[in-house]
């Protein structure tokens, strides 16, 4: 394989630029030509494809977002959109594609592979909801951003003896809430993967105040409900504390990536090129026990929440390895 392309798709994540940089520089070192596809699959269909050099990706490793830009393009789910994109790839002599993004992006990569264009997925999403990898690019930065914000909220919460509900991102996965909640010593961590009762939370808040506690921090994953709705239901369940709600929002998707995300993105980008060089497509790279791995895209493009609830109320473990990591971390924090 002599000519490949790289694109970013879906929601942006800190570290995407580091991954692009690794793809470009690794490919050049292997004697390949590299093209950047701007604006994701929409740009592929529109022919927004330009050659990239080592200079093109200079000084981007520390930048958040993606310099290739990103866009959601549901039309690529249709065969007509796929064929238009493939026509553009052929026009530029491209033989393989690295797709950086989340589960929706992976579905597009799978379609490309089915049409004879090897595509390798690189997990770029702050949600950490991709099966087959312990961590996704951007997750560590998002957790760090949430942690910093919650630390600041704790200062004002304690000053005014208030209860704060802090809503963090993560879509249908509670990973950001779990890790940020542990890191900030939150009083309650509410995630989609685990049930809860408002009455029990209210009782816990009341007991805390009776024991001399000055304030409370509740970290809420957006996949459960909005912070406003949660606050209203908490009040309806009998909470009488001075309650405030905060939605951290898109600040979690921005900012300079952490060292961990930069290194992770660099390793994943380079590994994706190694796979394409061997003619391997239809797979997504990941990290397991600090080692690079690859898994069939078909299995990794499903929802990657750690747990889900069955109709009988039992917890189903969707990703045992990630669940073990999270639960062991939670258990350690409780025992400290």
UniProtKB/Swiss-Prot annotation:
Needed co-factor(s): Mg(2+)
Gene Ontology cellular component list: 6-phosphofructokinase complex
SUPFAM superfamilies named in the record: Phosphofructokinase (SSF53784)
InterPro entries in the record: ATP_PFK, ATP_PFK_prok-type, PFKA_ATP_prok, Phosphofructokinase_CS, Phosphofructokinase_dom, PKF_sf
Enzyme Commission code: 2.7.1.11
Sequence positions that bind Mg(2+): 103
Highest taxon listed in the record's lineage: Bacteria
Keyword set, alphabetical order: Allosteric enzyme, ATP-binding, Cytoplasm, Glycolysis, Kinase, Magnesium, Metal-binding, Nucleotide-binding, Transferase
Residues given in the record as ATP binding sites: 11, 72-73, 102-105
Active site residues of this protein: 127 (proton acceptor)
GO molecular function, one term: 6-phosphofructokinase activity
Positions of disulphide bridges: none
Residues binding substrate: 125-127, 162, 169-171, 222, 244, 250-253
Catalytic activity field: beta-D-fructose 6-phosphate + ATP = beta-D-fructose 1,6-bisphosphate + ADP + H(+)
UniProt note on regulation of activity: Allosterically activated by ADP and other diphosphonucleosides, and allosterically inhibited by phosphoenolpyruvate.
Enzyme class per UniProt: transferase
Pathway in which the depicted protein is active: Carbohydrate degradation; glycolysis; D-glyceraldehyde 3-phosphate and glycerone phosphate from D-glucose: step 3/4
GO biological process assignments: canonical glycolysis; fructose 1,6-bisphosphate metabolic process; fructose 6-phosphate metabolic process
UniProt cross-references to PANTHER family, sorted A to Z: ATP-DEPENDENT 6-PHOSPHOFRUCTOKINASE, PHOSPHOFRUCTOKINASE
Function: Catalyzes the phosphorylation of D-fructose 6-phosphate to fructose 1,6-bisphosphate by ATP, the first committing step of glycolysis.
Family assignment from sequence similarity: Belongs to the phosphofructokinase type A (PFKA) family. ATP-dependent PFK group I subfamily. Prokaryotic clade 'B1' sub-subfamily.
HAMAP family xrefs: Phosphofructokinase_I_B1
Assembly: Homotetramer.
Name the UniProt record assigns to this protein: ATP-dependent 6-phosphofructokinase
Organism expressing this protein natively: Streptococcus gordonii (strain Challis / ATCC 35105 / BCRC 15272 / CH1 / DL1 / V288)
